[in-house]
């Protein structure tokens, strides 16, 4: 055991499985992956490989709590009972009293009169918790008029190719024949400025409240916006100071613009055709930056937006355009 360091004895016991080959579950899931947009693109191959090489899904667990596997098994034949009326009755019971109704209501209340409750075992196993989380699309999206299914985007850490993305795909494909998402975005994890996992024992944790107190919320927002979430995100005093400097440059650029436009009236507006070449060039660059930012937003490429806007403000506006035109203002 990883917790007690004591040796474990493994024993095989009968379990419930979801077959990856029956009804072409694996093949359909792989086809759905091909239709999905991944951010970053490398996530597609990772999820594809995991689905392609996974064994059948062991669905059952033996625990004292959880979502039950509502199945009756014939004690003589070992076959599960396949009766739509019984299944519908179980569904109705769950809607009224929750899934615990399976453990609280006797088998005779679910079975048709033609069945002898003594001939059937009411399974007490619970479902794998990943099956629970993989089903969230059903009650989050399908039961709400203001949302659509499938989801535009599933967003989680890169470890969820093996977890939530994985189970959601298999559950949805198995029950609905399609993936529950159109896109998947994965991000890295927050580390210290040396690339180490944060730990109290190492004393390298960073409390967001400390950043808010010492630097303000905008600095923390800029750190988020400027970090490449495709990789693990580093944070520390020097990194925060770096973003503080960027913030100061952006703020000074905006202050200069607002100060220069103080008292501007609409009737002072100049037609584009009458503008000097330098202003025409600048408006052209503004349009280029605008189009580039919109394109990057569509691709969730936020850290590139941060870099582009910062460079435009500090290099093209502040260092170039302002320097040329300041004599006209003063």
Regions found by a protein language model. Name each.
Residues 269-270:
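Generic long, charged, amphipathic alpha-helical segments
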Residues 1-263, 282-325, 329-330:
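Structured secondary-structure scaffolds
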């Amino acid at each position: 055991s990883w917790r007690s360091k004591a040796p474990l004895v493994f024993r095989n016991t009968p379990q419930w499985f979801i077959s990856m080959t029956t009804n072409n579950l694996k093949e359909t899931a792989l086809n759905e992956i091909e239709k999905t947009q991944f951010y970053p693109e490398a996530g597609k191959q990772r999820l594809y490989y995991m689905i392609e090489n996974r064994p059948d899904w062991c669905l059952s667990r033996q625990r004292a709590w959880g979502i039950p596997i509502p199945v009756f098994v014939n004690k003589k034949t070992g076959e599960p009972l396949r009766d739509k009326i019984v299944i519908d009755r179980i569904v109705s019971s769950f809607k009224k009293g929750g899934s615990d109704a399976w453990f609280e209501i006797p088998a005779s209340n679910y079975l048709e009169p033609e069945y002898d409750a003594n001939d059937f075992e009411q399974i007490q196993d619970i479902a794998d918790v990943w099956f629970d989380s993989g089903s969230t699309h059903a009650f989050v999206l399908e039961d709400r008029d203001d949302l659509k299914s499938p989801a535009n985007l599933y967003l989680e850490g890169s470890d969820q190719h093996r977890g939530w993305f994985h189970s959601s795909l298999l559950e949805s494909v198995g029950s609905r024949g399609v993936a529950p998402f159109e896109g998947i975005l994965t991000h890295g994890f927050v580390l210290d400025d040396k690339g180490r996992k944060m730990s109290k024992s190492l004393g390298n944790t960073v409390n967001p409240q400390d950043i808010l107190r010492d630097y303000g919320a905008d600095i923390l927002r800029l750190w988020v916006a400027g970090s490449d979430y495709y990789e693990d995100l580093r944070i520390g005093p020097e990194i925060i100071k770096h973003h503080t400097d960027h913030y100061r440059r952006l703020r000074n650029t905006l202050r200069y613009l607002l100060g220069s436009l103080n008292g501007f009236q609409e009737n002072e507006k100049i037609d584009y055709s009458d503008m000097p070449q330098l202003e025409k060039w600048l408006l052209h660059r503004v349009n280029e930056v605008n189009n580039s930012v919109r394109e990057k937003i569509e691709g969730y490429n936020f850290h590139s937006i941060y870099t582009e806007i910062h460079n435009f403000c500090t290099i093209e506006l502040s260092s170039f355009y302002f320097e040329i035109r300041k004599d006209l203002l003063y």
